[in-house]
Amino acid sequence: MKKYLLPESGTFYKANLHCHTVCSDGRYTPEQIKQKYLAEGYAVVAFSDHNRILPHPELRSDDFLPLTAIEIDFNAPTEPWSHASVYHLNYFSPDPDRDTFVPFERVYDVDAVSDLNLRAAKEGFLVQYNHPRWSFQQAADFLPLKGLWGFEVYNTGCEIEMQNGWADYEFELCCRAGMRVVPTATDDNHNVAMDEASPYNDSFGGWSMIKAASLTYADIFEAMKRGEMYATTGPEIRELWVENGVMHVVTSPCCAISFLTSGRETSTVRAHGDSLTEHRFAVPEHVKFVRVQAADANGGRAFSRPYDISELL
């Protein structure tokens, strides 16, 4: 029987799930963000200003959905901030009009952060762990975290600022450790350059494609919750399904497509140039998960979530 891992029906909506405005330390107003992201084909932006949750109902329209979110930071007290390890996490609200967050004590401690994550998740929030390399964090800092929904596999702002926006290895560690987190690619834009043609522009570099029934808050949030999405800096994962123990993927033209697992039982196809658009993989019964990665000749990469073996066989 054919089982779609990305829904057969619905529409892919382009989303930036990490954004800052003048409401914290960004340079653009929320309305400016809406117009600039609409012009680049985005339909969803999570307004995740620092340490304050602000709904933006005035931005809702038939072609644009603002997600209500907040980014919370926890800084290690043992070093100056420039050298300190930090936790930064986004919390996406299930209620578009929510304007208060879960009470918490700001303590740099994995158990304290996990406690907040679990309490936020109990209230319906989706919790995303952000930019581990920029945060100077080690595996021991993020692998024990509880309550995570998403993992930021790419962050444009960190890549522009310090060339450390990728977290693909850290994401792989999470997968191997049994964490079934959803990968996201985000901008974390602050728009300090205030010029989209500038080499310092930190918008439009990484995005998440969410497949949902419609562009309503409920449908987008539920699709995110179910992991019906993928992260990318370029390539598209257009179809993904499993049938009779074989996974199938259809992509935009790519130069490499991989099925990656909990072990070395993997399968990759490669080409000179972007001439590949599909691949298939017989799922070994003893692996713990399978995920898809694709790459194009421009250096763009796409990541599916890790599909647990129980979802595939």
Residues of each region from the PLM?
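Residue-level recognition of short, well-ordered coil/turn positions
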Residues: 42, 125, 179, 228-229
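A metal-dependent hydrolase metal-coordination microenvironment
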Residues: 2-130, 138-139, 144-147, 152-170, ...
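Short alpha-helical interface elements
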Residues: 40-42, 58-62, 144-145, 173-177, ...
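Catalytic-core region of carbohydrate-active enzymes that cleave or remodel glycosidic bonds
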Residues: 150-209
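Alpha-helix boundary recognition
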Residues: 38, 121, 175-176, 225
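C-terminal functional module detector
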Residues: 1-12, 181-182, 189-313
